[in-house]
């Protein structure tokens, strides 16, 4: 069985493909050159020194890996062109690739030509817009700059969409894309629903041209997160599995281009994989019949306690630099809002301040990662609470380094938003490393899919988080017992082999159903 996995948010496509290959499925993972760095396989499995900008992935060929990692030959960049696999040698990387796609220009145009100059200028402006969009606490000057860039972005989007849809000043590349649009309108899930694709609609779906070509080479496509939208452009005879990754809660019900397309893709997929148990209500609202809960697979061999049980060099250095006896790790992004995907990291900081203020507690340090929209607000809150000396900031850490920090800390704090009550990879990885995890966990939303609840130390409010910190800090035996139970639970319910076999079962059923339909 040869399958394609695309939409590598948090390396899900890469990990599922890797584990499926261990079971004999010829699984291939696809991602984008400009993708957020946490969607690159190197971020998951390579070890390297230094820190990188998560929003500007490097040319990995220039990075020296200290653990001998080599990119597997079953991992591919998706070009975003009708030929899905290889970008032209002279095509730009990073943000400039998106600009090239948005303008429908050809990468082979003269270096000094107006097309190249416009691409370069818009690439700079686009990068600035994106950097400002990632910050909630903008200065007045930054806010004005952001709004001006947003208006310019809308103007360029409208102009290019108008030109493309009406085939004005066509380039060879644009003519190929128009033909691909026509193919979608001739036969696809979108066409069978009575709708048609236009270039302005397709422009909202980056890399859309690659998916029909990819489908010719694989028996099944599994599309992750919002990439499931591209399933709407595939013919109905292509087996399709949609992988939910916090993308079924609200997006399919929004009256937007992406919302409507994702709604259609979920409803016409052969199967939907749910990773967040709370979205079962959304699956029912969509009228889905073939959905299945499969948790994020965890490689329990990689995410494990220190092999020899000895103090790690990281732990030794952190304790010496802070004078702390205990280390609390919170690697999640800084997001204070009440949006469904918020982490409410402000509650972690305030709870830790309460912990520090109690002199009966063992001295502790809080390790945070500097990423998320509210980093500036978190820095200010830490200063206002007077706990700067007890907080250690680290850049976003690749997973091998993060695993080493798990092995060096006493417990992990994750997310504390009342509207979710489920966990993602941070909690699962920490549990696998035999660490107690404090987060908000709602057992009720898991009852339909989990026969046994994890030993998560649930908390929601600042007071509850402080209480969990206190209980675990004052009782080393309890920390050890909770950690051991946590690892046992992960191995039983989240282990890589169990999850991979579930995916394999879904794929087999989807392909068999198509073969049965074609034989009738």
Predicted stretch roles:
Residues 30-32, 220-225, 233-252, 271-273:
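Active-site proximal beta-strand in glycosyltransferases
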Residues 205-216, 230, 248, 253-274, ...:
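Membrane-proximal helix-turn-helix segments that form the acceptor-binding/catalytic region
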Residues 273, 315-343, 349-354, 367:
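Conserved donor-binding/catalytic core segment of Leloir-type glycosyltransferases
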Residues 376-396, 411:
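Nucleotide-activated donor-binding/catalytic signature segment of Leloir-type glycosyltransferases, i.e.
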Residues 432, 436-441:
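Short hydrophobic beta-strand element within catalytic cores of glycosyltransferases
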Residues 477-509:
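A charged, aromatic-enriched C-terminal amphipathic alpha-helix characteristic of glycosyltransferases
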